[in-house]
Amino acid sequence: MPAIHDFACTTKTSRGWPAHAGHDGDEGTEAHADLLKENTMSDTAAIPNRAKKGVGLSGVTAGNTALCTVGRTGNDLHYRGYDILDVAEQCEFEEIAYLLVHGALPTTAELTGYKAKLRALRGLPAAVKRTLEALPAASHPMDVMRTAVSAIGCVLPEKDDQNQPGARDIADRLMACLGSALLYWFHYAHNGKRIDVETDDDSIGGHFLHLLHGKPPSDAFVRAMHTSLILYAEHEFNASTFTCRVVAGTAADMYSAITAGIGALRGPKHGGANEVSFEIQSRYATPDEAEADIRRRIANREVVIGFGHAVYTIADPRNKVIK
């Protein structure tokens, strides 16, 4: 592991950086792609059995991961041993993507090469563009991304041997081009425009904003995208990750696993909960109206979407940053 001063992300907080980028016993070299391909990792992210009453399979260890731990102290989140609060506002998203996919924070030289690789993967095959053009404007963005992954998997399929370097390349490609796919569909479906999806922007977040607005974004907007993408890059053994691993466990290809994971994330009891929460908030015309309705819901013992978490018993550590 290189010295910390050689990393592109050099800020060291008062908490300090761990000597090793993984947990105790973590080899620190397994990638996100490996997590989909293998059921044996060197460390477990499962909290010792703390079953909760009436919460399905709560307390049952479902598998192992070296990538991420959630809520071990009630309000913490770590990526390969790094505290999310140490990296969210200091690192670029590409650094954290490299950490998760390739096993360690990149050096400055490695980051430069990685960014160049991701820029080269932003384009979309013609067949994928035609598929996106066939989708109606009323399509949900999550459905568009699910379809895009499936289409890319048909045009650029994974090798039959499902080797790990190839799986990592697929992970990099999807990170680089899913924003391109979503915004190509958006502009075509809503404005009839076939946009050029290959920009010279230095980051995935900057590229997305450039395609969305049709012009290079400000540094402040790019920084906000870096922070947001980092905060939500990984979250241990959630429903979509579990879905991916079930599909990969049948020896299905990487694209099938990711497509299934997006389908799980689409659900209102997983990633879709954010959308439900936003829709509820949009109903209120004034703060007083919101307070009255929330109090009514609490009095009726109704679920108030957007509050609480099944794992974080104290608070979600991402909140203080994203606010």
Model-identified regions with their sequence ranges:
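Hydrophobic alpha-helical bundle cores within soluble ligand-binding/oligomerization subdomains
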Residues: S42-K323
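A cross-taxon signal for low-complexity, glycine/charged-rich
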Residues: M1-I4, A8-S14, A19-A33
